[in-house]
Amino acid sequence: MAPSWKFKFDGRILFIGYGSVSRCTLPLIERHFDMPLSRVTVVDAEDRSIDIAPFTAKGVSYVVEPIFRKNMAAVLARYVGPGDLILNLSVEVSSIDVMAWCQKNRVLYLDTCVEPWANYYDNPKIPEEERTNYFLRYSAKEKAKKWGERATSALVTHGANPGLISHFVKEALLEIAKRKKVKAAKPRSREEWAALAKRVGTKVIHVAEHDLQIANRPKRSGEFVNTWSIPGFTGEGAQPAELGWGSHEKRLPKDGNRAQGGAEMRHLSRSARLHDPGPLLDAHRRADDGLPHHPWRGDHAGRLPDGLGEGPRGLPAHGALRLSPRQ
């Protein structure tokens, strides 16, 4: 069914990467943007021309050209300029460096995670704490402080989850308030959302996703099947483990340490206890990127468990937590 509205966009759009996320996003651009597809370019590190053929037939330009630190500026300048948009949906292309280029050239920017250059997550020369999502996220925020209030918009880590799920969480808080008969106007600030979360008794937010993908070979009993980006998933699995820790939780777990030291084991070697049986803890931006939005700063504000404090290089911890290996 055709959408009832379309967003008119007069600029050009550059996709970096044509992996699993881009393949889902490009149809949305076609459906919801009022613009010719001839103004859309996809730059990819691998040749996926067969996969993207239905869109190149409609006018999308497809270029196979890996982006590295040394050629990044030249490649980007070839396809976009002031008023255009970059969708960085790749792996191993630095989000922070691309954002910095976008600021200099007045180009809009959006990505689904703060991605580093290649060979970062498993580089033993880089301290563990600097390989966490927490560190990458706040490094991007520190960089953005230099841009000022009139900077070109850059929306970071805003895909489906994290991203769209943040809007679902807000709707859920309003629905819980309605069911609990808590009278509250729709919050208009972080502080008001935090106050509403406290009023309705929110302590833990468990995001459960129902994957509707169907494979041509049924999943076997006890088999794990990855249904999204293989490079993205393996990259997450190589990162240190981290959790968001609530101010209502007065003690650290047995092998938990504060954020500034980084984690001492990889995500996919850390088990976690959830409603679902037998999970392993995987790196995910949702573990820390919602924390600054929902802290309660009223009564008992700032009384985090012993061991939680400043994050890496003095960045605010917001309850970020690292996990040490089991003995």
What spans do the regions from the language model cover?
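Adenosine-phosphate binding glycine-rich loop
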Residues: 126-201
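NAD(P)-binding Rossmann-fold cofactor-contacting core
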Residues: 34-54
